[in-house]
């Protein structure tokens, strides 16, 4: 399965929040933000902090898609 945080970026736009504001309110580092931007895995605790900061659920910021191998 591949992970995508496109829902997170859309939610930020919908809430009128900048990435820096999210970083500050969720207490996450710049390197973690870079991982999110690259759709890389991050610790579940970080995702929970993001959900808390945005008052949302995990499925509103993360999408899993099948990873088809040929």
Regions found by a protein language model. Give the residues of each.
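A short, Lys/Arg-rich alpha-helix, primarily the initiator
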Residues: 1-20
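Short, charged recognition helix plus adjacent turn
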Residues: 2, 11, 35, 62-70
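Residues within the helices of the helix-turn-helix
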Residues: 9, 20, 34, 48, ...
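The alpha-helix within a helix-turn-helix
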Residues: 12, 23, 51
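Short alpha-helical DNA-recognition segment
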Residues: 16-34
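Short, basic-rich loop-to-helix N-cap that marks the start of a DNA-contacting helix
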Residues: 40-52, 68
């Amino acid at each position: 399965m591949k992970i995508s945080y496109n829902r997170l970026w859309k939610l930020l736009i919908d809430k009128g929040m900048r990435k820096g504001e999210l970083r500050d309110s969720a207490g996450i580092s710049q390197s973690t933000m870079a991982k999110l931007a690259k759709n890389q895995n991050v610790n579940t605790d970080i995702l929970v902090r993001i959900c808390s900061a945005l008052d949302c659920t995990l499925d509103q910021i993360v999408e899993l898609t099948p990873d088809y191998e040929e």
